[in-house]
Amino acid sequence: MRDMEMRWAAPAPATRGRGRARRRAPDQPSFSSTLLDAICDSMDEGGEDGRTRNAASAAAKKRQEAANSYHYYYCYKPSLAASYRAAPALGSTADCPGRGYFSSSEVEYSLRRLRPIRTSAAGGAGDGAAVARKQRHEQPDVEKTAKTKPGSASARACRRPASPGARLASLLNSIFSGKRPSAQRPACSPDYPEPACSTAPPSSSSSYARRPCHAKTLRTPPTTTTTARARPSRSRTVRFLDIDGKVAVAAAVAGCRRIPVMEVEADTDDGGEESSDASSDLFELDSLAAIAPAGGRDGSHGDELPVYGTTGVGIRRDIGRRRPYGHAPCRSWSRAV
């Protein structure tokens, strides 16, 4: 216990000695005390000069911030960037705050170049009066041109699209006015006499001189509506005309003459012996060769096969003989021309 008390009690004199050694003389004050004394002295001694100096520094700082804000506003707005770039360089590069080559003086100059927008009532009234005066001066000219040029006004009116009501009114007027539209024309003219036509069949000699043509003549419709209603429209007709007229004259002189016409009848099967013989005799070449001659005049049909429908009993003898032109099982009749 006594040793512990001595251990705790021994350092006390040394601590006291150190504290005494750290104490400074009154002529050597500490850094914090000197700083505090300097601040107090500046506040007391400043007075009016200090206040004006602080106000000037604050104003300069505000102007710098405003210039910086205008710089950013002009640079990032496309509509005003051109006017900002077009401003002449009034200040030197030393005045630039460090953001490019623009200075605060350039920004102020560009701001002065902008024209304010007139929003006052007086300015609007003045503009309205000027516009009214212009309209008064221009109105007589418009009236003169409208009087001197009526055709141009009607042409402009025609160019405008018609409304549905106007279209309906024009349609009703055209219906009740009784005027026939120009598109409808009579099929043929009733004033011209009909030419004589020949109904005789064309012969081999005059067939090249005959050609089909339309007996239709177009002419303009009459001007009055009564004649147009009185004359009925005729249908279109097609006639065969003779160009030289020889056939028509000959037919008129000779009167009616009968021309034989051959009408070929179709073969009909009666189901008799002929059909059975015709179907069975197709392959009886030996009997056919015995009955038929050796050939025609030139012997060209001797080796040919028979044709279906020509191997009957009654017509076996005709095989190999040349038939005249137009010969066929038919009936002849004539018609009047």
UniProtKB/Swiss-Prot annotation:
Q: Where is the composition biased (Low complexity)?
A: 150-163, 195-209, 219-230
Q: Which GO terms describe its cellular component?
A: plasma membrane
What is one process in the GO biological process aspect for this record? Answer: positive regulation of auxin mediated signaling pathway
Q: Where is the composition biased (Basic and acidic residues)?
A: 137-146
Superkingdom is Eukaryota
Region Disordered, residue ranges: 1-32, 120-163, 179-233
What are the record keywords, sorted? Answer: Auxin signaling pathway, Cell membrane, Membrane, Transport
Q: Which cell locations does it reside in?
A: Cell membrane
Which family does this protein fall into? Belongs to the BIG GRAIN 1 (BG1) plant protein family.
Function description:
Involved in auxin transport. Regulator of the auxin signaling pathway.
Concerning PANTHER family, the annotation shows: PROTEIN BIG GRAIN 1-LIKE (PTHR33541:SF9), PROTEIN BIG GRAIN 1-LIKE A-RELATED (PTHR33541)
The name this protein goes by in its record? Protein BIG GRAIN 1-like
- Tell me what organism the protein belongs to: Oryza sativa subsp. indica
